């Protein structure tokens, strides 16, 4: 393919996306302080579409730790973990994460996407089968596809459908993979039933608790803490540090044997530069705050109840979510975009989520709540939604 043909193909694809209302572009916010952001044209908006569930992303304490360590050590690690990039800060964070989640050990990855690709590829391959919920995050589906294992998807949250698929399958090794909290719907996976199925069928269970860690459980240990499941019930736990923890990166936690295996086999960990020591040190502090400042979870839960009650009073439909993810399905992509723009005109930033992220005809306003929000800000959003979507 020559350069001209490539340009034509790209132009046609982009034009089709624009025509369907599916063209994407990053939105620039000059700054975000707590729940408020400053747009490129200088307007202040209340942000209701971030994943900063505990309001830690703008807390000054992790920032001060980062500044101190950056002053001492510079901005980067300089190498991969297995070369010369592994520092005491990485060790400290891995110990803190293992302790928080009740696992023997943890391994730090640069992103959640890399963690999911790396761990699935390290555990299964040709001759094996991966079973995934149809609404799993793209990184989980991509991990299964890239591993070479057979991918079999089951209906969302349907353990009976999964049981039938397990009974029909003759794979050498079988891995059940699920989100803990589903990122676009906000509902929780039936992890206790999945753990039982895994035991009954000799399969392994992997849970990506990106949106549950820090939010669910008495100590913020996530959906597995809330459900009382240990590392034998769920051998592979993935968590992210860029959502409730308010920092950056991800991790895999489980028995020491699992972590030792990943150090040998997880290509997305082996062949990449280790995270910045300064960022990592800041994350250690953020994890401490997420664990011990329980008022953040209590305030967040109160805001979720307040928002749902307000939306119910308006007669609008919400999905059955008790987490900070509160989606309002609008329908077509252009309708969701129009609603998002109308909310921004009223001072509220809520991103429209469109296909292919969600199925066609289910474009939505994905409202996310944070401990940084005030009750008054939540009430203001509810009133604005009533004006924009009022029936």
UniProtKB/Swiss-Prot annotation:
InterPro entries: Aminotrans_II_pyridoxalP_BS (IPR001917), Aminotransferase_I/II_large (IPR004839), AON_synthase_class-II (IPR050087), AONS_Archaea/Proteobacteria (IPR004723), AONS_Proteobacteria (IPR022834), PyrdxlP-dep_Trfase (IPR015424), PyrdxlP-dep_Trfase_major (IPR015421), PyrdxlP-dep_Trfase_small (IPR015422)
Pfam families cross-referenced by the UniProt entry: Aminotran_1_2
GO MF terms held by the record: 8-amino-7-oxononanoate synthase activity; pyridoxal phosphate binding
EC primary class: transferase
Keywords annotated in UniProt: Biotin biosynthesis, Pyridoxal phosphate, Transferase
Function field: Catalyzes the decarboxylative condensation of pimeloyl-[acyl-carrier protein] and L-alanine to produce 8-amino-7-oxononanoate (AON), [acyl-carrier protein], and carbon dioxide.
Quaternary structure (record): Homodimer.
Family as reported in the entry's similarity comment: Belongs to the class-II pyridoxal-phosphate-dependent aminotransferase family. BioF subfamily.
UniProt name for this protein: 8-amino-7-oxononanoate synthase
Lineage of source species: Bacteria, Pseudomonadati, Pseudomonadota, Gammaproteobacteria, Chromatiales
Name of the gene this protein is made from: bioF
């Amino acid at each position: 393919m020559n350069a001209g043909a490539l340009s034509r193909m790209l132009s046609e694809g982009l034009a089709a996306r624009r025509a369907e209302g599916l063209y994407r572009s990053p939105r620039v916010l000059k700054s975000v302080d707590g729940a408020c952001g400053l747009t490129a044209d200088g307007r202040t908006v209340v942000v209701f579409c971030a994943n900063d569930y505990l309001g830690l992303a703008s807390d000054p304490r992790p920032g001060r730790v980062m500044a101190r360590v950056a002053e001492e050590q510079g901005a980067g690690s300089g190498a991969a973990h297995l070369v010369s990039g592994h520092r005491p800060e990485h060790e400290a964070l891995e110990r803190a994460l293992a302790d928080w989640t009740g696992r023997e050990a943890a391994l730090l990855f640069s992103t959640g996407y890399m963690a999911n690709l790396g761990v699935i590829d390290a555990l299964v391959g040709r001759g094996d089968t991966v079973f995934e919920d149809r609404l799993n995050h793209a990184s989980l589906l991509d991990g299964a596809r890239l591993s070479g294992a057979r991918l079999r998807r089951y209906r969302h949250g349907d353990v009976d459908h999964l049981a039938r698929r397990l009974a029909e399958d003759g794979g050498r090794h079988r891995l059940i993979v699920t989100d803990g909290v589903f990122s676009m719907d906000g509902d929780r996976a039936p992890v206790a039933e999945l753990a039982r199925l895994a035991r009954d069928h000799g399969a392994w269970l992997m849970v990506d608790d990106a949106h549950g860690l820090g939010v669910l459980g008495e100590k913020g240990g996530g959906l597995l803490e809330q459900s009382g499941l240990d590392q034998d019930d769920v051998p592979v736990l993935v968590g992210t540090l860029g959502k409730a923890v308010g920092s950056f990166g991800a991790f895999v936690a489980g028995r020491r044997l699992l972590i030792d295996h990943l150090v040998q086999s997880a290509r997305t960990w082996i062949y990449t530069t280790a995270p910045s020591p300064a960022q990592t040190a800041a994350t250690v502090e953020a994890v401490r705050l997420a664990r011990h400042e329980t008022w953040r979870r209590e305030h967040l839960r109160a805001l979720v109840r307040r928002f749902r009650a307000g939306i119910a009073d308006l007669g609008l439909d919400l999905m059955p979510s008790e987490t900070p993810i509160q989606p309002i399905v609008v329908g077509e992509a252009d309708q969701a975009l129009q609603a998002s723009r109308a909310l921004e005109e009223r001072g509220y930033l809520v991103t429209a989520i469109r296909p292919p992220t969600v199925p066609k005809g289910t474009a939505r306003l994905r409202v996310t709540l944070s401990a940084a929000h005030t009750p008054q800000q939540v009430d203001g959003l509810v009133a604005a939604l009533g004006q924009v979507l009022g029936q």
